[in-house]
Curated annotation (Swiss-Prot):
Protein name: Ribosome maturation factor RimM
Pfam families, per the entry: PRC, RimM
Domain note: The PRC barrel domain binds ribosomal protein uS19.
Keyword line: Chaperone, Cytoplasm, Ribosome biogenesis, rRNA processing
UniProt function note: An accessory protein needed during the final step in the assembly of 30S ribosomal subunit, possibly for assembly of the head region. Essential for efficient processing of 16S rRNA. May be needed both before and after RbfA during the maturation of 16S rRNA. It has affinity for free ribosomal 30S subunits but not for 70S ribosomes.
One GO location term (cellular component): ribosome
Transmembrane segments: none
Primary residence: cytoplasm
Length: 172
């Protein structure tokens, strides 16, 4: 079974078994709702166990969660640095034009018939996602995921069609 990252445990929160999680999902309320089961992976990306969410709340840039059956800091301190993942069969269906990051990363990027590079990472700096395109012999291209730039995402052919706006590629 394949798993996908939804957050990283960065620290404990108080003494009552809560953890600070840096979320990497667009579905926070769904992923961290009470009763949701997530997989816990260690720093070496090895499966540790399935855990059930007992509670969730937001605090600043973090999601504060508590696992069922772990109600003291001593129960959870060992999980700092671990990753929370969701099983593939728990992924939600998306609307047309919406994609999971794992579907986008690795796609070839074309402008017209010219291959620009391959998407290696997705950043979330603010209003829209930014796709990082790895190019041969050039610096990475930061591609905003906005309609005038990203014209088509074709998952079946593993390609993205773009139109680079003036000033977007500083190496031209």
């Amino acid at each position: 079974m394949e798993y996908f990252n939804v957050g990283k445990i960065v620290n404990t929160q108080g003494l009552q078994g809560e953890m600070r999680v840096l979320s990497v999902t667009d579905f926070v309320e769904e992923r961290f709702k009470k009763g949701q089961v997530l997989a816990l992976f260690d720093e070496k990306n090895q499966f540790v166990m399935d855990i059930e969410i007992a509670s969730h709340r937001k605090q600043k840039n973090f999601d504060i969660i508590k696992f069922k059956g772990m109600y003291h800091i001593n129960d959870i301190e060992k999980y700092k640095g671990f990753t929370l993942k969701v099983a593939e069969d728990q992924l939600s269906d998306l609307k047309d034009g919406e994609f999971y990051y794992h579907e986008i990363i690795g796609l070839d990027v074309y402008e017209g018939e010219e291959l620009i590079g391959k998407i290696k990472e997705i950043l979330q700096p603010g209003a829209n996602d930014v796709w990082v395109v790895e190019r041969h012999g050039k610096r990475d291209l930061l591609l905003p995921y906005i309609p005038p730039v990203v014209l088509e995402v074709d998952l079946s052919n593993q390609r993205v069609q773009v139109e680079l706006m003036e000033g977007l590629d500083d190496e031209d």
